[in-house]
């Protein structure tokens, strides 16, 4: 007997990342090749015509798993009975805009969306914020949702998987090992140049990746800056921000969360106080996923260098939380 469709809400549906996401979700890459989906597409009133065009293309693919579509500019309609929400749409930073202004502009958007999700989505909804600054946007959405109740505030995540995948690729290049052989990578902190990609526990076919690299200068001066500033490098090269790789990371995050994974994965999740991170701050942690639930991997040793890096990215996040506290 075929499964009941799952409802997936996507904001910013007419945008570049949305366009890279929708066809892969409809083909079963995110929730499984036997799981029908209904896509609930949210975008601004002026983008509705473009959303209609994307829906026409989705129809023309004749995806067996695509059980229905809804297009709307009303968050209450978009999030109705949603099982998964991908919050892609966000106010981009424009020239001359201060980070504080960006936080305030997005704060308004994610307060509305967090409330609408909590009031309308399924109680066990899984929410992934892709739109930047994604950690703090997730923090804001979770705070708005908490006021309503119903949904689990721990299920409001920020996307660190893109940093994780970028780090894997750089390590594969450095070690000459296949990406698929690399296990137990961790990315701590904010999705920003302050993130800390940590391969101290990482292995490749049983070998220590730290021992294979064995180059502190490369780690500090090449690896971490390359991963941290990769988004800017792509804009420089392509003239547009990374859309397909961001969409791919979102699919990876939700797939592992819903379907489970035997691997360590990096997820931006509300802290429970682990590793000295204040409760509620949405922070990149090593996680494992089983049975539709995630848990933070405990007991990892934090050396002096790592603590310094973790504290640096934490400071950025606590500053952001402070900047938006009046909106919460």
Curated annotation (Swiss-Prot):
This is Malate dehydrogenase. HAMAP family: Malate_dehydrog_2. It is an enzyme of class 1 (oxidoreductase). Substrate binds at residues 93, 99, 132, 166. Belongs to the LDH/MDH superfamily. MDH type 2 family. Keywords: NAD, Oxidoreductase, Tricarboxylic acid cycle. The active site is at residue 191. SUPFAM superfamilies: LDH C-terminal domain-like, NAD(P)-binding Rossmann-fold domains. It comes from Dechloromonas aromatica (strain RCB). One of its GO terms (molecular function) is L-malate dehydrogenase (NAD+) activity. InterPro entries: L-lactate/malate_DH, Lactate/malate_DH_C, Lactate/malate_DH_N, Lactate_DH/Glyco_Ohase_4_C, Malate_DH_type2, NAD(P)-bd_dom_sf. Its EC number is 1.1.1.37. NAD(+) binds at residues 12-18, 106, 113, 130-132. It catalyses: (S)-malate + NAD(+) = oxaloacetate + NADH + H(+). GO terms for biological process: malate metabolic process; tricarboxylic acid cycle. Catalyzes the reversible oxidation of malate to oxaloacetate.
């Amino acid at each position: 007997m075929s499964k009941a469709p799952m409802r997936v809400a996507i904001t910013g549906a007419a945008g570049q990342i949305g366009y890279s996401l929708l066809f892969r979700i409809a083909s079963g890459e995110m929730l499984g090749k036997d799981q029908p989906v209904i896509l609930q597409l949210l975008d601004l009133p002026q983008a509705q015509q473009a959303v209609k065009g994307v829906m026409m293309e989705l129809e023309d693919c004749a995806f067996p798993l695509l059980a229905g579509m809804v297009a709307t500019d009303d968050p209450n309609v978009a999030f109705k009975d949603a099982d998964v929400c991908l919050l892609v749409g966000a106010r981009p930073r424009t020239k001359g805009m201060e980070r504080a202004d960006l936080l305030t502009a997005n704060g308004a958007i994610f307060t509305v969306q967090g409330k609408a999700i909590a009031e309308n989505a399924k109680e066990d909804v899984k929410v992934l914020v892709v739109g930047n600054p994604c950690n703090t946007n997730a923090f804001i959405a979770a705070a708005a949702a908490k006021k309503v109740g119903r949904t689990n505030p721990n299920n409001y995540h920020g996307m660190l998987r893109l940093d994780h995948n970028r780090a894997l690729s750089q390590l594969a290049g450095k070690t000459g090992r296949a990406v698929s052989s690399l296990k137990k990578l961790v990315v701590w902190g904010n999705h920003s140049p302050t993130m800390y990609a940590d391969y101290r526990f990482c292995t490749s076919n049983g070998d220590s990746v730290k021992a294979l690299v064995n180059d502190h200068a490369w780690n500090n001066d090449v690896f971490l800056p390359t991963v941290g500033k990769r988004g800017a490098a792509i804009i420089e090269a392509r003239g547009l921000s990374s859309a397909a790789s961001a969409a791919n990371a979102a699919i990876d995050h939700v797939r592992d969360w819903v379907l489970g994974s035997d691997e360590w994965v990096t997820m931006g999740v509300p802290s429970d106080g682990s590793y000295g991170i204040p409760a509620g701050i949405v922070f990149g942690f090593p996680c494992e996923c089983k049975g539709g639930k995630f848990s933070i991997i405990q007991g990892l040793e934090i050396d002096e260098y790592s603590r310094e890096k973790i504290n640096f990215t934490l400071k950025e996040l606590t500053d952001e939380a402070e900047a938006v506290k009046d909106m919460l």
